[in-house]
């Protein structure tokens, strides 16, 4: 299968750049799965999104993202976000506590991290 170049960039750092076979996330219009040669589009991510990047012969990347945008061309996916954490960087207890916050932005960030950990749909 042809590869899709993916770049995930947060305000503070370039999180990941590489080739993938499939990208999944949630936008304000609904869930989206992107394969190589996808039609071009721009979409806004939901505040509590998780991005899953599938790579040939490697484990999937699961990344919690805080808001942002997704840009798709036939050859590439670019995801620009406020904040992001790899699954391996997430403190599950802190994410759970944040998800129960009265502050909606904090709660959304907690839910995004729980999704990346596979603890929330």
From Swiss-Prot:
Subcellular location per the Swiss-Prot or TrEMBL entry: Cell membrane
Xref: InterPro entries: ATP_synth_F1_dsu/esu, ATP_synth_F1_dsu/esu_N, ATPsynth_dsu/esu_N
Keywords in alphabetical order: ATP synthesis, Cell membrane, CF(1), Hydrogen ion transport, Ion transport, Membrane, Transport
GO molecular function, one term: proton-transporting ATP synthase activity, rotational mechanism
Pfam families: ATP-synt_DE_N
Topology within the bilayer: Peripheral membrane protein
Primary localization: membrane
SUPFAM superfamilies xrefs: Epsilon subunit of F1F0-ATP synthase N-terminal domain (SSF51344)
GO cellular component terms listed in the entry, alphabetical order: plasma membrane; proton-transporting ATP synthase complex
Quaternary structure (record): F-type ATPases have 2 components, CF(1) - the catalytic core - and CF(0) - the membrane proton channel. CF(1) has five subunits: alpha(3), beta(3), gamma(1), delta(1), epsilon(1). CF(0) has three main subunits: a, b and c.
Function description: Produces ATP from ADP in the presence of a proton gradient across the membrane.
Family, per entry: Belongs to the ATPase epsilon chain family.
Protein name as catalogued: ATP synthase epsilon chain
Annotated organism of origin: Mycolicibacterium gilvum (strain PYR-GCK)
